[in-house]
């Protein structure tokens, strides 16, 4: 790369340099220059991006009671191998935690054709504000973060998944019956 043309505010400016550093996070500079770009794993499958959103109105005590009565909703590898203390007592005592689970709930909803996302678990992060969680459960499959059409379609699809996930939480997860949408992150997060 010997030069690049940047555009903004109605202007096109050519910049020359001995070295360019691509700070886009997506390899845009290399891709646009025709460089070979590696994407995804050995099968060229990329990790799905997500869109984080925050819910308020969550009753954590009711949620902890549910987990205490249904420990099968925690991942087996967590129960057996990773952390024996990852349970309802941990959630009650910890002001901020990452929850990973609900495999059985999603499987039951999938059998009924009511699972709103194609994934195995729900992920949310308890926030410092009372009754708030940041949800990381959106799933966008067959997505290329370097493709403009995928980015546009992904934004739309992610926003369409939010009300479906909220409905799932309200109708199926104790403690979430009165949850409401507090905020949505500005854009989808592309990991690779």
Regions found by a protein language model. Name each.
Residues 7-19, 23-24:
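Core beta-strand elements of the Rossmann-like FAD/NAD(P) dinucleotide-binding domain
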Residues 11, 31-46:
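Glycine-rich beta-alpha-beta "Rossmann" dinucleotide-binding loop(s) and their flanking helix/strand
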Residues 40-192:
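Mobile, glycine/GP-rich and aromatic-enriched active-site lid/loop segments adjacent to catalytic centers
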């Amino acid at each position: 790369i010997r030069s690049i043309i940047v555009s903004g505010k109605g202007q096109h400016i050519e910049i020359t340099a001995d070295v360019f550093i691509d700070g886009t996070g997506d390899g845009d500079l290399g891709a646009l220059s025709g460089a070979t770009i590696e994407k995804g794993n050995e099968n060229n499958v990329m990790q799905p991006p997500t869109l984080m959103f925050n819910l308020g109105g969550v009753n954590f005590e009711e949620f902890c009671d549910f987990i205490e009565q249904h420990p099968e909703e925690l991942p087996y590898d967590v129960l057996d191998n990773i952390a024996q203390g990852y349970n309802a007592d941990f959630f009650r005592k910890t002001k901020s935690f990452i929850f990973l689970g609900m495999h059985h709930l999603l499987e039951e909803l999938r059998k009924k054709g009511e699972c709103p996302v194609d994934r195995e678990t729900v992920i949310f992060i308890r926030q410092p504000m009372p009754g708030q969680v940041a949800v990381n459960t959106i799933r966008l499959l067959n997505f290329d973060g370097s493709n403009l059409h995928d980015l546009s379609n992904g934004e739309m699809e992610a926003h369409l998944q939010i009300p479906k996930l909220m409905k799932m939480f309200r109708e199926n997860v104790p403690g979430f019956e009165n949850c409401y949408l507090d905020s949505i992150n500005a854009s989808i997060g592309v990991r690779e």
